[in-house]
């Protein structure tokens, strides 16, 4: 992080010493601090074989069954038993392991809805992710008719949000929001957070690495009660950002499922193609013609390139859709929904789609433009191969800078990315049968 981001952070008390939390790799034996962990109710050794083992509310189990989920993922096995007890949680786990379900199920399990009182606050950095999290709450609370969830983000009329919050009948129990809009509502005294029991940040590294966003979050945090549960999740948590996250917590349970060198995704085939910039369009067309895929997401580095490439694909009879931050908010959401509902199979996007967005049919991710950072590569290709399914990631390498990023990716994630074979790849290696 840059020096300017090393701002003094909100803490509970200068004199309060934060005890060393239990930290472990999921699935490993007890750490050296096992005695201390026992005192706090360590999660070590708790491995549920089904969601019923978590003793969740019948309404939640019924909704989980409707979704077709039988067995919790590794991160869910580790997190849920402690998070439903109100323990603070800092969790890093690779894309596609169901981190969202951890905090959605945990907060719904603990929720006792009271009219006009906001009990759960979830903060995320993009509007699309906020929309998706709201939908997850709707999915898992379908048999809890008294529970109301609302999403608040910029680009929509703030008066509409204020009206919903003023009325006891429409005031939600669960708020999912982006930091800017939520901060504005707090400043206007339009939202009452004095009853918040759960404070969640998804993709917390992205939210807290920006100084402006972090200041907003600190102000929001101060408006909530001192005693509450704090949970933070991300696929990437650098050593620099972890202490920043823990400043908001009290004795958190720290869970790092796989260390930093092993954050690669199960079932994902990864390749690169060396070519000149002017050759990209022809190669992309060839790939879309020759590869089998359900849905594909193509990442570019700017909104202008997204629009241009989208026009080109449509002109070449590849019906695509573009999603990027340059679109009006309502249009962005409509396009996101259209792609998610399988109305289009090809999406051209900037990094607005690169984090947390979960569309289960995507099994091909193409980096038309490589990202500048290795971590962003993980979030991008993680759109394919979600929840342990197969997928294919292909990256175009056209400059010296691209070659350097590719080297960083392979070093950072301890993975060998090979050149895409001339004869192509067997669909069975990346398509689920």
Curated annotation (Swiss-Prot):
Residue window of motif DEAD box: 202-205
Primary localization: nucleus
The biased composition feature labelled Acidic residues covers: 1-17
Q: Specify whether ATP-binding is a keyword of the entry.
A: yes
Keywords attached to this Swiss-Prot or TrEMBL record, sorted alphabetically, are: ATP-binding, Helicase, Hydrolase, mRNA processing, mRNA splicing, mRNA transport, Nucleotide-binding, Nucleus, RNA-binding, Spliceosome, Transport
What EC number is given for this enzyme? 3.6.4.13
Catalytic activity, reaction form = ATP + H2O = ADP + phosphate + H(+)
Taken from the UniProt entry, a GO cellular component term is:
transcription export complex
SMART domains hit by this protein: DEXDc, HELICc
Keyword RNA-binding, does the record have it? yes
Kindly state the positions of the motif Q motif in this protein. 49-77
Domain (Helicase C-terminal) ranges: 267-428
Cleaved signal peptide residues: none
Annotated spans, Disordered: 1-39
Places the protein is found: Nucleus
What PANTHER family has UniProt attached to this entry? ATP-DEPENDENT RNA HELICASE DBP3
Which family would the database say this protein is a member of? Answer: Belongs to the DEAD box helicase family. DECD subfamily.
Q: What does this protein do?
A: ATP-binding RNA helicase involved in transcription elongation and required for the export of mRNA out of the nucleus. SUB2 also plays a role in pre-mRNA splicing and spliceosome assembly. May be involved in rDNA and telomeric silencing, and maintenance of genome integrity.
Q: What is known of its domains?
A: The Q motif is unique to and characteristic of the DEAD box family of RNA helicases and controls ATP binding and hydrolysis.
Question: Which protein are we looking at?
Answer: ATP-dependent RNA helicase SUB2
The organism is: Lodderomyces elongisporus (strain ATCC 11503 / CBS 2605 / JCM 1781 / NBRC 1676 / NRRL YB-4239) (Yeast)
What phylogenetic lineage does the species belong to?
A: Eukaryota, Fungi, Dikarya, Ascomycota, Saccharomycotina
